[in-house]
Amino acid sequence: MTDAVVFPSPIVLWSKSEEEREGKPLLVMLHGYGANEQDLFSLAGLLPDEFAVASVRAPLMMGPGFTWFPLTGSIDYSVDAVLKASDYVLDWLDGVKHQHPSVTLLGFSMGMAMATTLLRRRPADFAAVVGLSGFAVDGGAHADFRDGELDGTVPMFWGRDQQDPVITPDKIEFTMGWVRRHVKLTKVLYTGMWHGINEQEIGHVNEFLTHEVLNK
């Protein structure tokens, strides 16, 4: 796989027309490894209609789909590649966020790594984060991760199955430590979901978004 960005700016699927979405809270969907912007977009109709949903395609080709940053077989990554991917999304967000009163991030798997990275780089920019069957990046002491500014007030939903066969234990351990220190956490464990999303979880996400974003 090449490190070259396939698209100069993200390809985005919107749930509403440009006229309809202006002034509505923005919910940005970030798909997982090897998927595309269609993957999570089917969930848009199951979430509160008050949101304008934008499902963003990752910039790097991976098989028939796309990825935010390269992975090795052990799900390892380069922090610099993660930061480059987050720049790609932040540059796009900077061009659209002025049309919305708030921005919330929803990421699945690698998309959760992206969502939490975006929050850590811009701690004041996001109303909430939803992480589904994913992890937060261990950025070490890299200055671009502004964890010291995250004081536990930003709401975050983290749903996962303890039997998830994809996300490795070291990544769960790091993520557990990070969320406990830096966000207002709603954590839910599911059974029989494996590395996926189920109807019960989407119901919980719906409640979380309504309570933590729309009712604020």
Label the predicted regions.
Residues 3-100:
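Serine-hydrolase catalytic machinery in alpha/beta-hydrolase-like enzymes
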Residues 42-43, 168-178:
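Short alpha-helix in the alpha/beta-hydrolase fold that links the catalytic acid
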Residues 65-77, 134-155:
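Flexible "cap/lid" loop of the alpha/beta hydrolase fold
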Residues 105-107, 132:
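Short beta-strand immediately N-terminal to the catalytic nucleophile in serine-hydrolase-like folds
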Residues 107-111, 115:
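Gly/Ala-rich beta-loop-alpha elbow adjacent to hydrolase catalytic centers
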Residues 124-137:
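A conserved short beta-strand
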Residues 157-160, 164:
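Short beta-strand/loop motif that positions the catalytic acidic residue
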Residues 173-216:
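C-terminal catalytic histidine-bearing segment of alpha/beta-hydrolase fold enzymes
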